[in-house]
Design a protein with these regions (language model features):
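Generic detector of short, locally flexible boundary/turn motifs and exposed helical patches
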Residues: 2-7, 17-18, 54-56, 85-90, ...
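Active-site cofactor/substrate anionic-group-binding motifs, chiefly glycine-
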Residues: 30-84
Length: 133
């Protein structure tokens, strides 16, 4: 499905929206059933290079105690999530786009997939990144 069709579907109203929601529920129940899946949130760093005024971890906020979890701490948390049947984890940090940071996250993703036999889903929330990243 292309982007234009998705946008059109999301903009539906009235009976068409009702039918869309009904169909989406049918697909969801067929694919994953009527279940709840746990997702672990791993806030591994609050270091950020941006200065967004709305954000509590913005670069200029000197009242924040900064932290950056070790790779072992992150991998241990992911292993815990996998051992306890979490469907996925979110790796979240402030926005950093340096090459060492990108390399670190790339290595973590590979190790998480390895330790979970490629079973643990991963969502990244590390701010805006370049298309190539």
């Amino acid at each position: 499905m292309d982007k234009q069709k998705i946008v059109r579907l999301l903009q539906t109203e009235g009976e068409e929206r009702t039918q869309l929601l009904k169909k989406s529920r049918e697909v969801k129940e067929k694919v994953v059933g009527n279940k709840v899946y746990f997702r672990g949130l791993i806030e591994f760093s609050n270091i950020c290079s941006k200065d967004c005024l709305y954000c509590g971890i913005r670069k200029s906020n000197t009242n924040v105690v900064r932290y950056d979890s070790t790779d072992k701490e992150i991998l241990d948390a992911c292993h815990f999530a996998w051992e306890n049947s979490f469907a996925s984890v979110v790796l979240q940090s402030g926005e950093v786009s340096s090459k060492p940071f990108i390399h670190r996250v790339d290595n973590l993703l590979k190790k998480i997939k390895q330790l979970s036999n490629n079973e643990l889903g991963i969502t990244l929330s590390c701010g805006e990144q370049s298309r190539e990243t």
